[in-house]
Amino acid sequence: IKEDLSPVAYQWLETADARSLLDWTRMNRVLPENNGIITAVRGENEKKVLFEYMLALDLKVKRGEYADFIRAITPLGVDLLEIVLEQSCDIDITRYYKRNNQRIWDKNRLVGEILDILNQKFYPFRYGPVYSAHLLEIIQKKCTDTLMVQRIQELVNIEQNVRNVAAHNIVSVTPEWIKERTGKSVDDIFWILKYVCEQVKINTRKENWNSYDSMNKRIIDELDKD
């Protein structure tokens, strides 16, 4: 296929493929320069990585890959809740984790008020992996933005209602299946995710949500030139 396309068209196709797979190293290498649509994604830029993850989730929905969409909510949820704690509650929750970027509670570091909050709900608190339900409990006790707390509660409820079923059982995950188990449509769920992202400034420009559409239009334009 490479021989049949202009270098720019092929660059864009490779960029789109790498982007949809969240392969930033490859995407950054083949990305057309100064293209006005996408800029390089660096792993240390957490908000940009999360925004690209959100766009990839939107792509899964558009492709009808609902099981993948549901499974992807869990890691994204914990990421978002950590940022909410930092920005809305002024708590760097990672201070209570084991070192080396592990999402595991550290018995020596998790002390004081945060441990008290977790013990109230999960007595006796057993440490181990960090779950969104743990972070939700802290947000409910420490954040004053009631609407944000409500949205986070909805998000964690959705995750808990569908995660285990979709992960451990052979089921056909459809929009109807999701609505039946969560009370929310796929669009509702994505709207909640977008709301949280915008509140914590993961994305501040609404047109950025159409980035994949802009990229696809550019690809079509380049292919039409060939």
What are these regions (language model features)?
Residues 43-131, 217:
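Amphipathic alpha-helical interface elements
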Residues 141-211:
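Charge-enriched, short contiguous segments at helix-coil
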Residues 43, 74, 107, 128, ...:
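Intrinsic-disorder-associated interaction segments
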Residues 19, 54, 58-61, 77-84, ...:
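A structural signal for well-ordered alpha-helices, especially hydrophobic packing surfaces
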Residues 202-226:
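Acidic, carboxylate-rich catalytic segments that either coordinate divalent cations
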Residues 130-139:
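Solvent-exposed, low-complexity, intrinsically disordered
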Residues 1-66:
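Charged alpha-helical initiation segments
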